[in-house]
Amino acid sequence: MSKFPDLPGMKNLDANPYEPELASFDDMDADAGDGDAVAKTGTTTIGITTDGGVVIATDMRASLGGRFVSNKSVQKVEQIHPSAALTLVGSVGGAQSFIRTLRSESDLYEVRRGEPMSISALATLAGNFARGGPFFAINPILGGVDEEGSHVYSIDPAGGVMEDDYTVTGSGMQVAHGKLEDRYHDDLSMEEAEELAVEAVYAATERDTGSGNGVYVATVTGDGVDITGYDDFEGAR
């Protein structure tokens, strides 16, 4: 089958439709080698919506294959947008690359349009990148606030995007989900959501070997993102 000639200003029809504008996925190295040798966050990450904003909480542990604790102070939630944050779940390298790519595209959109991208559009972009890119074994949570309200999305490794009032991803999700199912209600304040998120992460660290060593809490409102780390759970309550 013949290939169309490359014409000036014409987009390459063979290009990956899910690629970011600023780079090609072909230029990015996927995590290689034995999966057990890849640094993974293990992880329990939680996102909760309230009328006042979004609360995200994560533990701090990274491990090698879930058997050796390689780092005890990993920040697993990063700001990627003026009023949105994303968690790191899965391989550390893949998650960090994913965050850098998504943040760059969000910044480019804001520069060109003069306004931030909507959170639903940001979630769609994140799903497209997860589906089309070399980001190895990631399953992050995106939480943000825009004119339509507070939003929490889970992004699966195949690019699936699901919005909910609250969600959990990572190796400790079964334990943390139980705490949220028992305590969550629609009228949570931001302070109550913070307390619940921290308690759910703590519950997961009691049983999940991939989670532990403290907690990061991010509060997301229309005014911005605030991220604070605590070496012990008592300090976060």
UniProtKB/Swiss-Prot annotation:
Q: Which cysteines are joined by disulfide bonds?
A: none
Residues of the propeptide region, as annotated, are 1-42
Q: How is its activity regulated?
A: The formation of the proteasomal ATPase PAN-20S proteasome complex, via the docking of the C-termini of PAN into the intersubunit pockets in the alpha-rings, triggers opening of the gate for substrate entry. Interconversion between the open-gate and close-gate conformations leads to a dynamic regulation of the 20S proteasome proteolysis activity.
Q: Name one GO biological process term.
A: proteasomal protein catabolic process
| Record has Hydrolase as a keyword | yes
InterPro entries assigned: Ntn_hydrolases_N, Pept_T1A_Psome_bsu_arc, Pept_T1A_subB, Proteasome_sua/b, Proteasome_suB-type
Q: What is its EC number?
A: 3.4.25.1
Q: What class of enzyme is it?
A: hydrolase
* GO molecular-function terms, A-Z: threonine-type endopeptidase activity
* Disordered: annotated span: 1-27
Q: Does the keyword Cytoplasm apply?
A: yes
Highest taxon of the lineage: Archaea
Name its cellular compartments.
Cytoplasm
Family that this chain belongs to: Belongs to the peptidase T1B family.
| Role according to the record | Component of the proteasome core, a large protease complex with broad specificity involved in protein degradation.
Record's subunit section: The 20S proteasome core is composed of 14 alpha and 14 beta subunits that assemble into four stacked heptameric rings, resulting in a barrel-shaped structure. The two inner rings, each composed of seven catalytic beta subunits, are sandwiched by two outer rings, each composed of seven alpha subunits. The catalytic chamber with the active sites is on the inside of the barrel. Has a gated structure, the ends of the cylinder being occluded by the N-termini of the alpha-subunits. Is capped at one or both ends by the proteasome regulatory ATPase, PAN.
Name of the molecule in the record: Proteasome subunit beta
